[in-house]
Amino acid sequence: MEVESKTSFGGMESKSKEVKVVTGGKLRPFDLVLRVVALALTLVAAVLLGVDKQTKVVSLQLLPTLPPMDVPVTAKWRYLSAFVYFVVSNAIACSYAALSLLLSVGNSKGNKGLGLAITVMDLVMVALLFSSNGAAGAIGLMGYEGNSRVRWGKVCNVFGKFCNQVAVALGLSFFGGLAFFLLVVMAAFALNKRH
């Protein structure tokens, strides 16, 4: 004779061979936390790079016989298409994170079609964020190191604040993309458990 013990702990109900979520499994708290994290990180990354601007006075010598001229030079995110792509991608991901958060909370009936659409869009956000991070990272690296083969000098020695702000925005966006990636992985594990 098998004795079935019934214990309840942290929203989980356990019998001898099965574990089920008492709340019905419709609302996953870790899913909501990751969506809030993705929303916050992509919002801060977009705003941080969107307000990034630095002006410096640079000495420019046109001819060796002429004295150098001091010229104000400004670095803005809008001057590089990779940074524009980065800001727009993070704004899209942030908007989607807010929408998907509302849809996830509102999906109390467990609509499978909506769940699949959210998972597919999470995957699209991973691709969008990682591609924009790669593009902005490549330009940022060019700013830090330059490229001697094409005679592009490094500019981060002059525009240090601008470059540091780009680096922080890239890091935040990377972790925002990682949050979306974890959402996709969780959805894949949930799908695997069902089958």
Swiss-Prot record:
Protein keywords: Cell membrane, Membrane, Transmembrane, Transmembrane helix
Question: How is it placed in the membrane, per its record?
Answer: Multi-pass membrane protein
- Which is one Gene Ontology cellular component term of this protein? plasma membrane
Query: For side Cytoplasmic, which residue ranges?
Result: 1-29, 104-122, 187-195
The places in or outside the cell where this protein is found are: Cell membrane
Q: Which residues lie on this side of the membrane: Extracellular?
A: 51-82, 144-165
Q: Which residues cross the membrane?
A: 30-50, 83-103, 123-143, 166-186
Keyword Transmembrane helix on this protein? yes
Query: Which protein family is named in the record?
Result: Belongs to the Casparian strip membrane proteins (CASP) family.
What binding partners and quaternary form does the record give? Homodimer and heterodimers.
User: What protein name applies here?
Assistant: CASP-like protein 1E2
Source species, please? Vitis vinifera (Grape)
